[in-house]
């Protein structure tokens, strides 16, 4: 059984990302690279809210991890001149935990709830009047003697972030006025991020090298910055500190990140579908068990990039390796699979 521990190119935040992201994170919307549709929405709605002297309507950011949801929350708070309070769905275990947070908010503050799809129902119901009416309903007493008291809350902005928007309940989703789908970044955008980060880190990165780093960053800024830091280390020890194409290729080979941005785990996943399941279809639960990982982790962390790059496809019967996968591993493509799934790469 394959164990997926300490994966270098995971889009999830790891300990070393904390300092990197804090130093490299843009603080204004105009500095934010990529996500042009989201930026334009937020620019307009923030300006309109400020012109009226109101809080920004509640915002839902959704998409794969590592694409800049927390960064946008920080920017929104700064633009609205409010404080940012950060928490997560799993951290709010009881309704009282959320009530305690809500009562500390001030006018125009921003409450950022990561993994909002993991809120339990009792906690979620506290949010409904808070989002709609800026009010907190508290029940005092028990049984027949119980009574409800409504407390007014300041006008705040709730920003919810999720990788699984389909798991949000309709009542919660419908209370967000600004919906922002986050997409993987293209190579040009990632190259610009790498160039910007290189300047902040005071390291010279040649354009060719920046493009190569972008190509192998899985469409994810968090991974791009993490890889940049490791290639910087390699170039300082094995070269003159300048990140050129040669140094980049050597460092990425050492890190076992191939031309598609795949690491050894991606390769094992794809080869498992090809070799152990005859190219598919294979159910996600079966695949997760085979590679020794949780179902949600496969679906949230690993699969989105493989789907986006066209190396696997979803079918009603399970996941299937595409024609592109066969070509990548120089395997003979089975005619029955081509005819059955009508690959379009």
UniProtKB/Swiss-Prot annotation:
Binding site for DNA: 314, 319
Source species, domain of life: Bacteria
Principal cellular location given in the protein's record: cytoplasm
Region annotated Head domain (RuvB-H), chain positions: 259-345
Region (Small ATPAse domain (RuvB-S)): 186-256
GO molecular function, one term: ATP binding
Known function: The RuvA-RuvB-RuvC complex processes Holliday junction (HJ) DNA during genetic recombination and DNA repair, while the RuvA-RuvB complex plays an important role in the rescue of blocked DNA replication forks via replication fork reversal (RFR). RuvA specifically binds to HJ cruciform DNA, conferring on it an open structure. The RuvB hexamer acts as an ATP-dependent pump, pulling dsDNA into and through the RuvAB complex. RuvB forms 2 homohexamers on either side of HJ DNA bound by 1 or 2 RuvA tetramers; 4 subunits per hexamer contact DNA at a time.
Assembly and oligomerization: Homohexamer. Forms an RuvA(8)-RuvB(12)-Holliday junction (HJ) complex. HJ DNA is sandwiched between 2 RuvA tetramers; dsDNA enters through RuvA and exits via RuvB. An RuvB hexamer assembles on each DNA strand where it exits the tetramer. Each RuvB hexamer is contacted by two RuvA subunits (via domain III) on 2 adjacent RuvB subunits; this complex drives branch migration. In the full resolvosome a probable DNA-RuvA(4)-RuvB(12)-RuvC(2) complex forms which resolves the HJ.
Name of protein: Holliday junction branch migration complex subunit RuvB
Gene that produces this protein: ruvB
């Amino acid at each position: 059984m394959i164990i997926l521990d300490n994966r270098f190119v995971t889009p999830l935040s790891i300990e070393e990302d904390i300092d990197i992201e804090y130093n490299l994170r843009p603080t204004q919307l105009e500095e934010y690279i990529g996500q042009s549709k989201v930026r334009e929405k937020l620019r307009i709605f923030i300006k309109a809210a400020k012109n009226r002297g109101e809080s920004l309507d509640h915002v839902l950011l959704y998409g794969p991890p590592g694409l800049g949801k927390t960064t946008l929350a920080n920017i929104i708070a700064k633009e609205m001149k409010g404080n940012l309070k950060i928490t997560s769905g799993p951290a709010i275990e009881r309704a009282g935990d959320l009530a305690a947070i809500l009562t500390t908010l001030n006018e125009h503050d921003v409450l950022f709830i990561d993994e909002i799809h993991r809120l339990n129902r009792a906690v979620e119901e506290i949010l409904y009047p808070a989002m709609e009416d800026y009010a907190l309903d508290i029940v005092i007493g028990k049984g027949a003697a119980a009574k409800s008291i409504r407390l007014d809350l300041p006008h705040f902005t709730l920003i919810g972030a999720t990788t699984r928007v389909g798991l949000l309940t309709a009542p919660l989703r419908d209370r967000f006025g600004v919906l922002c789908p986050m997409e993987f970044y293209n190579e040009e955008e990632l190259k610009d991020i790498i160039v910007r980060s290189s300047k902040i880190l005071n390291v010279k990165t040649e354009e060719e090298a920046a493009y190569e780093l972008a190509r192998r960053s899985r469409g994810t800024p968090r991974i791009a910055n993490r890889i940049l830091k490791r290639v910087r280390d390699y170039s300082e020890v094995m070269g003159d500190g300048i990140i050129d194409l040669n140094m980049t290729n050597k460092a990425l080979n050492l890190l076992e990140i191939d031309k598609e941005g795949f690491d050894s785990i991606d390769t094992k996943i794809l080869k498992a579908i090809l070799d152990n399941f005859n190219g598919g279809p294979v159910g996600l639960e079966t695949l997760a068990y085979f590679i020794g990982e949780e179902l949600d982790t496969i679906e949230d962390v690993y699969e989105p990039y493989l789907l986006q790059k066209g190396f696997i496809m979803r079918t009603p019967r399970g996941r299937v390796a595409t024609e592109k996968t066969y070509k990548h591993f120089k395997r003979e493509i089975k005619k029955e699979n081509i005819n059955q799934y009508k690959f379009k790469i």
